[in-house]
A protein has these predicted regions:
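Mature, structured domains of secreted/extracytosolic soluble proteins
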Residues: 1-235
Length: 235
């Protein structure tokens, strides 16, 4: 499917969604990732009118047709990358600030081509992690590695995680000898990472990957981290 077709499909949502039925959160459009059949997500913000992906607002709502409803918008809604979706959702403003401040040009990396899974801490998670400190107090190289500890190098959906049940995967964070640090996941009670952070909103699909919103920053792990998180080490 060509880009123009995908952009048009990115303006179509299944079902009749009157403006009064829309609420802040994510919906799926008919556009898909180029390398999968996953439907792209759209962030709807109803805090001040109806704003879509942070770039377009509903100008004329609720034009009824025989097979659906049309909402006239004031800007074309482009195909969103991971960074686009982070920018669209005010709950991720601290994450965007951290990505911008860290070494490694992470905003560019996560805006570019690739297939990533980002575990995205919300603003409350960053506030708890910083514990009164400023983002600028964290060395930029350390901040980059902490952020990369939330990035996987492939698309992993919540269905994939639940299907696996529990186990280890690799993040893009650097460990000893430049090896990639591991991440432990367990789906016994929701989806939990390294025993410290849980998925609050799953499967925000973008052109270059997927986002899972999480409720806590995942620190760089030690041996004790995995011993405490993995029930196989409980005895």
């Amino acid at each position: 499917v060509d880009i123009l077709t995908q952009i048009l499909l990115n303006h179509v949502i299944v079902g009749e969604n009157a403006s009064t039925s829309l609420s802040t959160g994510y919906v799926s459009t008919l556009a898909t990732q180029s390398n999968s059949d996953l439907n792209l997500s759209m962030f709807v913000d109803t805090s001040n009118g109806v704003r879509l992906n942070g770039v377009s607002s509903v100008a004329i709502p609720d034009i009824d047709a025989t097979n659906g409803i049309i909402h006239v918008v004031d800007a074309v809604i482009g195909l969103p990358t991971i960074v686009d979706q982070a920018l669209a959702n005010p709950a991720f403003s601290s994450l965007v600030a951290a990505l911008s401040a860290a070494d490694g040009n992470l905003v560019s990396v996560l805006s570019g081509e690739g297939t990533f899974t980002v575990l995205a801490p919300d603003n409350d998670a960053f506030a708890t992690f910083l514990n009164g400190a400023a983002l600028g107090d964290v060395p930029t190289d350390a901040l980059a590695n902490i952020l990369l500890n939330h990035v996987l190098g492939s698309v992993v959906t919540s269905t994939d995680l639940v299907g696996a049940g529990a186990g280890y995967t690799s993040t893009l964070a650097s460990g000893p000898g430049m090896s990639n640090l591991s991440l432990y996941f367990n789906t016994t009670e929701g989806v939990r990472f390294n025993g410290v952070s849980s998925v609050a909103a799953a499967d925000v699909v973008t052109t270059n990957g997927i986002i899972h919103a999480i409720d806590a920053v995942i620190p760089i792990p030690t041996v004790v981290t995995f011993a405490a998180a993995d029930p196989n080490f409980s005895t």
